[in-house]
């Protein structure tokens, strides 16, 4: 249930007001991102989440709640409470592995997701690319970065092959291997977009695995594999710019050196693929 309040509350206030019988537990799912913790009562567990990006508008967090409210429980956690800066969702029991599942199994999960009703809001990458440029460290802004940004702005985003609800952050850490099948967590980037954008954004280990995932998906979706792969490739420069910009943005936000290393690695990939 959504609970409207303009006044932020503390963790203790949240628990005492809405979950008085629950208590925090110390075991965490490795797939959870920062700002999340588990609560438990008589074997029932919930995940209490906060926005990953403290500077993001509250509307982005609310959209995540709305997306989870629309999705079937067989692929995503069911939400129970939303209020400012807090969301409570089901804990998904299972294993979070360090590698992706079989490509055919993952293709089946993504194809099922893409058959669901659309969320109602579009994913557009250009505003994000421009935001990350504006919010990055001025010392890190280069002529090459600006040149690539202008090139994408002029080219415009690829026309969607098929418009569907997307997760947009599919990697091993966001996949729960449960007894009932694969499920996805961390839906903060969800929205409607091109199925090829989703496939392009999957954090794969190598090109061979990526091609196999696209081929397996194409079989289910009854699309020519070569056609789908061409569309996936059209999204590559957009996604690499998105990743690089996000790492730069997070570096300025947190000062964490890992983001500089990830940004530098992504810029190198962009130069190679040009």
From Swiss-Prot:
The enzyme's E.C. designation: 2.7.1.89
Family: Belongs to the thiamine kinase family.
Key words, A-Z: ATP-binding, Kinase, Nucleotide-binding, Transferase
Disulfide partners: none
UniProt name for this protein: Thiamine kinase
Organism expressing this protein natively: Shigella dysenteriae serotype 1 (strain Sd197)
Annotated GO biological process: thiamine diphosphate biosynthetic process; thiamine metabolic process
Reactions this protein catalyses: thiamine + ATP = thiamine phosphate + ADP + H(+)
Pathway annotation from the record: Cofactor biosynthesis; thiamine diphosphate biosynthesis; thiamine phosphate from thiamine: step 1/1
A molecular function GO annotation: ATP binding
Coiled coil: none
HAMAP family the record matches: Thiamine_kinase
